[in-house]
From Swiss-Prot:
This is Beta-ketoacyl-[acyl-carrier-protein] synthase III. One of its GO terms (cellular component) is cytoplasm. GO terms for molecular function: 3-oxoacyl-[acyl-carrier-protein] synthase activity; beta-ketoacyl-acyl-carrier-protein synthase III activity. It comes from Syntrophomonas wolfei subsp. wolfei (strain DSM 2245B / Goettingen). InterPro entries: ACP_syn_III_C, ACP_syn_III_N, FabH, Thiolase-like. Homodimer. The gene is fabH. The lineage of its organism: Bacteria, Bacillati, Bacillota, Clostridia, Eubacteriales.
Amino acid sequence: MKVQILGMGHSLPERILNNQELEQMVDTSNEWIVERTGILERRIADKDTATSDLCWQAAKMALERSATEAKELDLIIVGTSSPDMLFPSTACIVQDHLGARNAAAFDVEAGCTGFIYALGIAEKFLLSPEYKKILVIGADLCSRFTDYTDRNTCVLFGDGAGAAVVGKGNLGPGILSSYLAADGSGGKHLYMPAGGSALPPSKETVEQRLHFIRMDGNEIFRFATKIVVAVSEKLLSQAGLSYQDVDLFIPHQANLRIIKTAMKRMRIPAEKTLINLDHFGNMSAACIPVGLSMAEEAGKLKKGDLVLMVAFGAGLSYGGILLRWGRDQDVF
């Protein structure tokens, strides 16, 4: 039995925030942003849009593409760092909106690795006979926690959501290997100080701007360039494959320099690497599922293609999924 992706979906806000607009907001320039990040523009949700809104929109597309009804879902997992509220979970809000009454629902908070964590967890659930179809979503409204007076972080982030319906198939296409990991000692390099039980919201935390993303970019760069290669090697080794076998490499879209460094070390060419951060920025947990969904939509994937997905994020969390693209005709 293989765990297969039965259908993908994505949702992106309409509003585009380009580098020229950011030039008017902070001390930066289009040239500075492009040179250091590779980003030209990003999508920003309007004030009335919540993470769950993008989630259910992406989910509806995935359900339609997989020919799945909401009532068939056994579980919904949402990977997000920007839930609608502390509770109930965003997954429960999505479950209600979709009318997926038979599905259990919970969120996973693994930063930008959220979708990979959620998909890896779904894979394990599907090894049980109780679960047949699971909706996995990676979504974040990073703009809600971005400090638009900090030029080092405000140029990076965008909003979006990607979804996958996963199920069981016979031997053939499907997940070949998965790996989830974390290094909690690096948590201090990427975090949001206030808003939790350690430092609850207060007048003081708001005045001190403690509800925004804090990041040590140099530390994250050093971590990411090593870990992307290490995770990729582990996934391919587990499956008895090599870099030369990869048809599509989908890395987390944090920074173009990180991606190019990984490509060079792994000798994966540009034509086999998905890069969309130039138009969408870092959408956190949404990067990989949005990329995969749009690649399928554009006809860039064919059955049998080997897809390598690797992410890293706050925690510091990291992980990856290696899969053979496609689905059986007799999915049950």
